Amino acid sequence: MYTIADTVGGAQVPLACAGLRQRAPRFDLVENRLERGLQLGLLTPGVAQRTRLLARMLDSASLSGEEMGSAFGISRAAVHKHISVLRSAGFVISSQRGLGHSLVEAPESPVPELVTLLLLGDPRMPAPGEAGFLGLPYHHHAEVGSTNDVCRGLAEAGSPEGTVAVAEAQSAGRGRLDRIWCSRAGQDLTFSLLLRPGLAPVELGLLVLAIANGVALCLAEDVGLGSAVGLKWPNDVLVNSGKACGILMEASIDMDRVRWVVVGIGVNANSRCSELIGVGGTPPGKEPPASIGDAVGSRVSRPALLVSLLARISASLHQLDAEPGAVVRQYEGFDALRGRTIRLTSGYGGRELARGVADGVEGDGSLRVREAGGGVGFHGAGEVTVESVAGE
């Protein structure tokens, strides 16, 4: 649980964690954005009303049911019903005769009302209906097979760009090349994001880099990990040379256009590194798992982390639209492979595609490799293994 204790600009906000510099929700934004989200059908009236109640409780020491009902045009009984739902979602709300209701603690889980409040109150995120808005509709599940599978179904059903599916646990989580992705229930952050980009299939390589940039910037700047954050082509996010986040992008393509893209992101948020290493240990040439919580030395607020990731990804997608070359330059600042001796295969233990020194990425997002014979190869896909060399 995170105590509602920090006061920023006169408004109490959820304490995120040491290291995650969570911006206080902009309450002046929340109400207008809630109305717009309702008009667009991006959230239900119940979630919207409970988000309003949370915002009001955060903005005041305490409020009576009568005051809340009057402010929102609902009965005291309806107020009590909404508060009961919030309590069942993990919010600790104090109710005292003569003093009213006050919010004491927020849940660690990324429940819809808390995520909606943080999302709509974040000035970095465009408003619902504006280009670049991400995060709604929001689907929060206790357990699914895979959030990517859930999001693929939503995509085919016509859900709009920006739809997010989050799960506390996955029974069939997967990464690139059909590898198993393991995450601990209630500890880590696993979610999928639906995009409907106006891209040609050949441009998907740059989209991968843009998403990776957004995640890296969130961890480096918002979480405060700085130079400890790196990117291993194409989209592994490293912290202190260990893998802290995996990204899986799946797309539906019709001839010369991309219908939709589902971006699955798994972050080792609060698991300990010792809990993530399998019985067989880390394969040679591969990165051991890393944990954000271990790196910052405290638990991470998953709701705050999710919203910050979405805001950073939104900005990266805007950069991709406005200046594709800037995406490559941004990526190069995080490139953890450049200058390393690598082997590129069709899969772990698969057919060798290239061997040499990684030399950055091309304008289309492909990996540039300077091979031992002096040639230069360009590769749009493959599995990278870092080889041990003398002095390294």
What do these predicted ranges mean?
Residues 13-22:
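Low-complexity, glycine/proline/serine-enriched flexible coil segments
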Residues 23, 31, 41-62, 66-75, ...:
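Long, positively charged amphipathic alpha-helical accessory segments at protein N-termini or as interdomain linkers
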Residues 6-10:
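Intrinsically disordered, low-complexity segments enriched in glycine and mixed charged residues
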Residues 21-26, 33-36:
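Basic polycationic patches enriched in arginine
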Residues 173, 236, 266:
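Active-site glycine-centered loops adjacent to acidic/histidine catalytic or metal-binding residues
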Residues 2-5, 17, 40-221, 252:
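N-terminal lobe of the biotin/lipoate ligase/transferase fold
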